[in-house]
Amino acid sequence: IVKRGVTELITPGVSLNDGVLNSKTNNFLAAVYFGAHTGVSFLDVSTGEFLTAQGSTAYVSKLLQNFRPSEVLIEKQKRQQFSTAFGDNFNTFYLEDWVFQQGYTNESLCQHFKTKSLKGFGVDGLPNGLIASGAILHYLGETQHHKLKHITSIERLLESDFVWMDKFTIRNLELYHSNNSNAVTLIQVIDKTLSPMGGRLLKRWLALPLKSVAAIKARHDVVQYFYLNETALMEIQSSLKGVGDLERLISKVATAKVSPREVVQLKNSIEQILPLSLIHISEPTRLVSI
């Protein structure tokens, strides 16, 4: 006798299916909470990235335009407010208002991370952002996504760290999309990355230009190093060609959705990490985020 029951609900924001996901694009599930400050949170369940922020409606609008979530969770009674503030171009799902109670969401987050508070993550000053984050965890439970050990931290997005572009700027610059079907976007021109992780990181960097001169210079220094050391560049590129999508493979292991073929891919990818780690040990400046 086979026990029947709902084992998983697939929605746009929680898919782990490679046939649905774009390897070089994050698949974010977002939640928005309206309060004195608008809270917002983004989770890519396929990679484990968990981000939160709060601020003005204009700031949250820019975040939504830059992260382009596949699905947005909001309170049932705030449908019209969301539509007025952010438009109707998002896939939305409405949750009961009690899900967005601060006590409930904080408890959900602390239980998930197995901590007594969230101070260690540097997000305790974002109460409305954390309400949105807790609502995301609730939704994952509702859709039968209970194995989430790969989500190990939550990070804050600081408005002061980046240049934030509105939807009109993003559209006019044709960063990743164009209304002209024959047009070539900026990301298509500059993306020469060899790994899916690198492709997603490049897209993130393009969406969130840095303000800090020191941080910009640090990136330039890495580029200069590889420009002047072609042998090192080719050595790393050779290793990267054998690396699969480690972030998503590890997430599939954590969620018990990995296939035998993907286990082999993970093994082969890990074997390529050793040469990279040796490069890192011998010359730290030669290894960048990939």
Where are these regions (language model features)?
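Charged catalytic and DNA/RNA-contacting regions of genome-maintenance
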Residues: I1-Y225, M234, S238-K241, D245-A254, ...
